[in-house]
Amino acid sequence: MSEQRKKKGESVGQTIGGMLVGFDQQIFRSTPPVNEMVAKGDRLAPVAASGGGTMRVGLPGDPAAPDAAPGAIDPEIEVLRLSAPGVEALVDLVAGGRIASLVVDGRELLRTSRDGPRDWGSFPMAPYAGRIRDAEFTFGGEVRRLAATMPPHAIHGTVLDRRWHAIDGTTIAIDLGPDWPFVGGVVQSFELTSDSMTCRMELHADEPMPASIGWHPWFLRRIAGTAGELELDVEPGAMYARDAAGIATEELVPPAPEPWDDCFTDLRRPPVLRWPGFLEMTIESDCPDWVIYTSPSDALCVEPQTAPPDALNTDPTVVQPGRPLSAVMTWRWRSLAP
């Protein structure tokens, strides 16, 4: 088993749902205040791309939010709304702590249609990213079973469809839930500027556990009023070979041509998304592995993660108490308008 890929400095924290949440001072720096924190039942004013009316964020049919854990600023907060000149973002706490919307210069960049919790916005993956073969893994000499969320496999972790809680205006937290056989939790922090959005994640363990984390954004291929379809510029050094079940193995092979639903590593430079005549976005991350999914006709996914799919069964990172697993992702954009 591999050691954690990086170590962090001393953390300070507070107890969230029985878990000590460490706010690593090297990671969670102060960020600009959000414009709004929207409570349950309040009406949310439209973001710039919505064209008027009101907008309700949260999956239909979600249960009422449970009582907040100690340290949460308000158990009724459902949405964080961040803004900067020319940019607005919504973070939906009810729908898995995801970025539900990112509007730049009046245009939405993310898929917002909601066929299911794995199909929209940009959601966090924890305590595992990607598929886990047959929804099981062995740790400490014991076979651990997971919920088969993509039968017969498990996929994308236990926090993407559960309710998060606001810790402050830019920070949210959740425990790992009943479908994970270890005790721990996740903290996310967000920072928005006029030309970038940064997401930081920490997974905290109350006991040694294998884990990986990452993000799964859905970027729209076509944006109304722009000149053409989204282009992806990426140069991976290697690709994890997939087996007959479609799950990444430990074997590294030369990258195959598109379409992709594959995990890559050793990228020569950060991936770049380009909407011709509108916007260019560079995706930066300290994650070593990237899943890229190009098959959908209306969107594509570029997913930084700390380990490849099925890492719990191959070469798991073991997270220790007091030594959180952390990752950072930044979307940085510039205008291509003439």
Predicted regions and their residues:
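Active-site/ligand-binding surface loops and adjacent short beta/alpha elements
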Residues: R56-A68, P208-P210, P217-D286
